[in-house]
């Protein structure tokens, strides 16, 4: 990995991390750095770095193998949920259980299918997660992505 002064980024990170605590399977390898961006701008900064990157959310159903010379970016702190009437804008790191709870507290239904799914919105979108007769795509209007 090229020399990058990560301290100048002002983004929370940790060095020499074993990923077994970051996935539901408790399997892991050691990585030189794990970063926790709090917003889209911090995520963009990390994605623009000239090094190998691996992005994780909750680590649900993830098996980590060798990630030598790779930085890990955890989206766990990107969990903003904004209500605009009956429309939600949700960041990728928000857990499905948090989104469901917020929906129910605001009188919105349709997301109950996610009960018991341990993942995040980001992971649910990638896999079209579903259970109990419903999927994430059933209530989806649009997705914004970073290219």
Stretches with model-predicted labels:
Residues 11-19, 23, 56, 73, ...:
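Short, functionally important structural connectors and interaction interfaces within domains
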Residues 53, 62-63:
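Acidic/His- and Gly-rich active-site-bordering loop/insert found
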Residues 24, 64-65, 120-122:
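Short secondary-structure boundary/hinge segments and terminal tails
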Residues 28, 34-40, 63-80, 126-147:
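Structural signature of FAD isoalloxazine-binding scaffolds in flavoprotein oxidoreductases
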Residues 1-56:
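N-terminal, positively charged, Ser/Thr/Ala/Gly-biased leader segments
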Residues 40-45, 49-54, 77-124, 146:
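FAD-binding glycine-rich core of flavoenzymes that anchor FAD
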Residues 9, 86, 139:
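Residue-level signal for beta-strand positions within conserved beta-sheet cores that form or flank
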């Amino acid at each position: 990995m090229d020399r990058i002064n990560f301290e100048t980024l002002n983004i929370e990170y940790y060095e020499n991390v074993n990923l077994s605590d970051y996935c539901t399977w408790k399997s892991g390898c050691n990585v030189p750095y794990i970063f926790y961006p709090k917003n889209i701008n911090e995520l963009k900064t990390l994605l623009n770095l000239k090094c190998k990157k691996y992005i994780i959310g909750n680590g649900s159903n993830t098996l980590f193998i060798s990630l030598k010379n790779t930085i890990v970016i955890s989206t766990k702190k990107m969990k903003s949920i904004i209500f605009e009437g009956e429309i939600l804008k949700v960041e990728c790191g928000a857990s499905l259980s948090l989104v469901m709870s917020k929906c129910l507290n605001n009188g919105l239904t349709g997301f109950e299918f996610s009960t018991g799914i341990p993942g995040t919105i980001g992971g649910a979108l990638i896999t079209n997660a579903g259970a109990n007769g419903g999927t994430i795509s059933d209530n989806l209007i649009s997705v914004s992505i970073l290219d």
